[in-house]
Amino acid sequence: MTQPKVVNEQVDVTALYFRKSKNGLKSFPKRIEYEGEALTFMESGLQIMVNKGQELIELFTMTDGRSDYRLRHNVTAKEWTLMTISQNA
């Protein structure tokens, strides 16, 4: 894996998928729009939830099989941010 490219741009999540968990269903981004392209992720990913004051932040690490993407979802503000892209070797 190469050094991650820092992006820090808001993106649109155009599709979600759901996975069973102990507490019900968890949602994950399935497809985003970035620089005019639709990027579709494989249905495997990591999710971390963080409370930052009054805000609930979800951090996701997703892959399309070629690159890894780190996304930040501000649940309170309903904003998605593409933080980094890392090319797989």
Label each region the model flagged.
Residues 1-89:
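Cysteine-centric segments in proteins
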